[in-house]
Amino acid sequence: MCLLIAEEIGPLEELEHFSCHVCGAELNYAVGMARLGNDVSYISKVGVDPFGKCICNFLKANGIHDDYVWTDDDHMTGFQMKEKVLEGDPTVANIRKHTAFSHFRPADLSGIDWTGVDHLHVTGIPLALSESCRETIYTLMMRAHGKGVRISFDPNLRPMLWKSQEIMARVINDAAQYADIVMPGLNEGRSLTGMDNERDIAGYYLQRGVQTVVIKMGGSHGTYIRTADDQEYRVPSYHVDHVVDTVGAGDGFAVGFTSAILDGLSLEDAARRGAAIGAMAIQVAGDNEGLPTREQLAVFQQNA
């Protein structure tokens, strides 16, 4: 979707000047993977409007294929408005209801060519938007699973998009069982499973067929990993002196972790790369501006 970022500090409803960007957890992930040199296709649906064209132009400019970005003549492209803050989390307003993507349907997926596809990344956000969108994401994950494609799933909870906590947990957990890698934050895991500690949260998903559970512990607490063969790892985070914008940190972690897995690195090294890219992302304003190239990543990890 498109993102209107306030150019002045203050409540969104009182401001007049905004700059237009492109955002979204899945898009941030696609940008990050492309910057690391991976061949990336983006799956979405946009309106026939300036925001939709802006998104497609942005994808092409970042080397991301838009063959699977379908258009909808009858519904608009969704967008967000985000406050400008000096530090910490900004307030974000979502305009998502009745958008083109909320009318995403399983039939839209018929044109996908799975030849040569190694990995699919999904977040829980689309599952909240509509019943048809939910059915489409389930279908996408089942088809990828059937083709032997590795699937990573970041719950990326947005409680304000759901009718209730109970529905959110049920739907997110139903989707998670199709994934090979599930990557919740610690508080997300608690909310979704009712479990308190990271080991039990991981066990909840492992019992449902997930192969690897990666729990982002938050702040300086690093990452906890548990696998289906009951291997456990703890990987520290990187220290950041000045946090500019925390939005996109989780997407950066997902980029680092899954790209490292695709490169054949160990789970521990994958978590280190994820932590590094997450740390780089929060030092720059914007959702994906801080996502690095391989060269920038190498310099950061060498100097950290």
Show which residues each predicted segment covers.
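Glycine-rich phosphate/adenosyl-contacting loop at the front of the ribokinase-like
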Residues: 1-65, 243
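Short beta-strand scaffold segments in enzyme catalytic cores
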Residues: 31, 79-83, 222-225
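Short, conserved phosphate/pyrophosphate- and ester-handling motifs at nucleotide-, phospho-/glycolipid
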Residues: 33, 185, 250
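Conserved N-terminal subdomain of the carbohydrate kinase-like
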Residues: 39-124, 298-304
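Short, electropositive alpha-helical surface patch
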Residues: 51-64, 169-178, 202, 239
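Conserved beta-alpha-beta core of the PfkB/ribokinase-like small-molecule kinase fold
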Residues: 119, 125-204, 221-222
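Conserved phosphate-binding/catalytic region of the ribokinase-like
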Residues: 142, 194-304
